[in-house]
Amino acid sequence: MAGIPHDHYEPKSGLEKWLHKRLPVVALVYDTLMIPTPRNLNWMWIWGIVLTYCLAHMIVTGIVLAMHYTPHVDMAFASVEHIMRDVNGGHMIRYLHANGASLFFFAVYIHIFRGLYYGSYKAPREVTWIVGMIIYLCMMGTAFMGYVLPWGQMSFWGATVITGLFGAIPGIGEPIQTWLLGGPAVDNATLNRFFSLHYLLPFVIAALVAVHIWAFHSTGNNNPTRGEVRRGSKEVVKKDTLPFWPYFVIKDLF
């Protein structure tokens, strides 16, 4: 983590040293978990770990649902009913996925408000903020396409209205709308595209989350006083901070 003096991973056993020279993945995990974190963080800082849980929750439940879903206009709704009625625990998995999305957005709005209130968008954390906003846009796109997948009346007309917004762009809007729909109107090609992107984007979000974490590990965490951690030496840093693991992980869990 650039800029903040801290203890680095030191391999001890022969196997650890061998792996560290070739693939320092243990050092990466160590530096991620042991980031010096300001001691004065309040409850507004718990939402990052809530969002991490939500993303993992959505990916796992989504993969299970995708095993039973059929992206075809004649079978999509029936496949959702099949999940609800015939798949063991299918109704629970679907509701966990749908309500998990609500928790995801609830947590991300508080996370964004925290950033606005405490100035986390200001230097030196602009990149962290920008990546976070890209994640938010990807979340909105993923949620919208997931809403379309059951292929009921609200799904169909929702897809028609939202894609129609792109058609209103002067000059280039109509080609963009046609490309999004896969044809002149909402149809099977649209459903296939939306399902494919709905499955893909969560993994894009996961990659962006890794970049997001990398960015704030480089600059250090913000805190309620908005004061920067003193960085003269490891001893000085330890007076202002504690390691993220185990102190803040345990605090966030409880």
Role assignments for model-derived ranges:
Residues 1-254:
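Membrane-embedded alpha-helical bundles that constitute the cytochrome b-like, heme-associated redox core
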